[in-house]
C-alpha cells in the first residue's frame, strides 16, 4: 500500500513513477532456506517453482498488477545497474517501510543508491524511510559508506521521529519527519480510486499481523464493551493454516482488508498500517504495540495525533462514542499531509 499511495501522490504532481521490482529471489540462501522450512513446518506445500507462494499471494499480485507500475524484475546488481543506465529518470526515491533495516534487506547498499554513480545528476530522495528497529541494526563498519551515500541525497525524510537524531549523530545527515505514504491519500481518494464498498458494520475488526490468544482476548473484550462481535483478519493465520490445504492459505484481496477497517465500528490491531488506515478512515482503534522492538513507528504516529490512550490497556475507552475528535484528527492529518506533500514537491524540483 505504501508503493501504491506514493505512486498516486506522485501522479497527482504530474510525474510518471515506476517502482523497481527487486524480487525476493535476491535474498540470501539462508533466508530462502528459512522460508522453505516455514512453509514445510506449517504444512503449506512448497516447491522451488514458487507455485505455492504465487497461489497464496494471488490477490496481492493482482492488486500490484492492476494498480502499481513496476520495472522488469531486477534479479541482480548487474541488472539493476543496467536498468539505471537504460532508463534515465529525474529522481530516485527510497521509502518507506523498513527499507533501511539490515535484517530485512540483504542488498542494503541498493537502498542507499550505491548503484547510482556519484557524479550523475539525478535527484536522490528518501521519503518516510525507516530503520525498522531502535537501536538500528546496520553494522558499524557500514557507517562511513552510508554517510557518504546519504550526503549525496537532495532531501531525506523519515517515518519515525527517533530516526532524525540517528541520521544526524551517526551518519551526519539532516532529515525531517513526514507522514507514511499511505496517509498522503484521503479516505475519499481510497474509496474512489479502488472502488471500495461503504457498508458500515457493527463489528469490531481485529487486524493482527501475528495472531495470539492474548490478542484475540483483547479483541473479545473490546467487542463485549461494544455489545457486538469481532472479526479476525490475520495474514499469519493464513500463512500457518494447517491440514495441507494450499487454498486455505490464500490471502484475501487487499480491498477486503481496507473495507474491513473502513466499515468497522472500531479496530483492534498490532499493525502500524492498521493504525494508519484507522486514522485515515476515522475509526476508533486500539494499538497492540510490541515493546521488544519496532515500537517507535507506533509512538511517532500516535503521539503526532495525541492518541497515546489508544495503546493496549485502554481498551475500555472504545465503549465511548466520542473516543477521539474525528474532525480534529482530520485537520491535523490534512496539515501533515500538506507538509509532507510539500517536502516531496520541493525535493523533486
Per-region residue spans from a language model:
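Leloir-type glycosyltransferase catalytic cores
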Residues: 244, 248, 303-349
